[in-house]
Amino acid sequence: PENQPDHFTPNDTISGTVRTGLAGTFTVGGVSPDYTTISGAIADLVFSGACDTVVFNIRNGTYTEELDIPYETIATGAVVIFKSETNNPANVIITRNYTTGSTNRMIEITNASHLRFNDLTLKVTGTVCSSVVYMNSYCADIQFTGCNILGSTCNSTSTSGAVIALVNGQMDDIHFESNVIRKGSYGLYVSPGFSSFANDLVLEENSIDSAYRYGAFLNRIQGMHVIGNTIFSPTTSSNGIET
């Protein structure tokens, strides 16, 4: 410094970890997979980010996991796809059994975006009301297509038993298309909060049945598209759609 020799060099360097972002197709489960668990694939995605579209082909089997998907870095124009390798939801079952607790969430998506879930069976079982899919904070561009999204029996009006819950933050471009949504206190519960909205929510060609309170409760939504859905209410205490 100041044209003099530096006799103390330990503070002259920095270090960090650099990893290449994910891109391309990866396998989960089965023989010689890229990832043995779905949770492992998500952890790598969160750590590395995605520099292009990523497809996680999930091989046939039952995966007993609880999935937490937080904010992830995904390149502009790219998406991350979780799908059955055979494109048959009966072949890939992601499940979790709950017997205690009041805020159980098998798949929790927090402040995340650009996700696709295709042709999967997502299922909770057990003796307490639980959610299969729970989105909160700001979530955008997330689609569930061709999935069986199956809650447990929940004879309660509690929102903690909603099969799918979108709450506590703005939601943009969330799509549910051609899914089977079953049981729970609500099939779908959307309530972003007093200061937020769900924008451009799409519900198309879904079969929603056996929810205890409402097939779909839709609150504070701008630009809603509800087309060709079938809602079956099994008791006189349950209703179809509430807005």
Where are these regions (language model features)?
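Right-handed parallel beta-helix/beta-spiral solenoid domain characteristic of secreted/periplasmic
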Residues: 74-130, 151-159
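Extracellular/luminal regions of secreted and cell-surface proteins that mediate adhesion/ECM remodeling
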Residues: 1-22
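Acidic Gly/Asp/Thr-rich repetitive segments characteristic of extracellular carbohydrate-active
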Residues: 23-64, 68
